[in-house]
Regions:
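Extreme N-terminal leader/targeting segments of oxidoreductases
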Residues: 1-16, 34-36
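Conserved N-terminal/central alpha/beta ligand/cofactor-binding core
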Residues: 2-8, 44-188
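Core beta-strand elements of the Rossmann-like FAD/NAD(P) dinucleotide-binding domain
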Residues: 11-14, 186-196
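N-terminal Rossmann-like FAD-binding beta1-loop-alpha1 element of flavoenzymes
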Residues: 16-41
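Long alpha-helical scaffolds
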Residues: 32, 165, 194-196
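Short, hydrophobic/aliphatic alpha-helical segments
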Residues: 36-47, 194-195
Length: 196
């Protein structure tokens, strides 16, 4: 009787489990896969429907393609000022230093940014930035970013679970070690276990 009453869950195990397939989730899954981890990616709707696709402005990166006075230090100062100096100093610094490489990486993965007449990535002005700094794809930068991340991620061996709703997190102390998710397409629960 106990076996009859206990629900049977499909069990899946990964080194890394990422919940959310927006820009941050896809990028985290790609990075984990590049470190040779087995990766599961859970998204609540279809892949490509994350809110990131609605981002229009662009990616702030001090590449100096339009104004050669732009540097990561100026970008950092703009970010701190924009956050009224209560931002996390180290995160703002890392963002300013690493964002040009992130834009180049997206381009290597197939993102098609708008171009200057001489072929460099075009950058435009945006509120709070001292120099034109936003790498963009017209007014659909988020959509292009997600497309490039998805295309690259799919070829990295990341297993994607679409239309899954996470119902519970399982923790070992303060560490999340798994989730219970409902597969809305098939109508049953799955138990995902992960090391990270």
């Amino acid at each position: 009787l106990e076996t009859f009453l206990m629900p049977q869950y499909e069990k899946l195990e990964y080194d890394v489990l990422v919940v959310g397939a927006g820009g941050a989730g896809l990028r985290a899954a790609i990075e984990a896969s590049a470190a040779d981890a087995s990766v599961g990616l859970i998204c609540k709707s279809l892949l490509g429907k994350a809110h990131t696709v609605m981002a229009e402005g662009g990616l702030a990166a001090a590449m100096a393609n339009v104004d050669d006075r732009d540097t990561w230090k100026v970008h950092f100062a703009d970010t701190m000022r924009g956050g009224q100096y209560i931002n996390n100093f180290r995160m703002a610094q890392l963002h300013a230093q690493e964002s040009p490489q992130c834009v180049r990486e997206l381009e290597e993965w197939g993102a098609l940014f708008d171009r200057t007449k001489d072929g460099r990535i075009l950058q435009r002005n945006f509120g709070g930035h001292k120099f034109p700094r936003l790498a963009h794809v017209g007014d659909r930068t988020g959509l292009e970013m997600i497309r490039a991340l998805q295309d690259h991620g799919i070829h990295q061996g990341i297993e994607v679970y679409m239309e899954h709703t996470v119902a519970s997190l399982f923790k070992d102390g303060e560490r999340v070690v798994g989730v219970l998710a409902y597969d809305r397409e098939r109508g049953h629960f799955k138990l995902f276990q992960a090391k990270a």
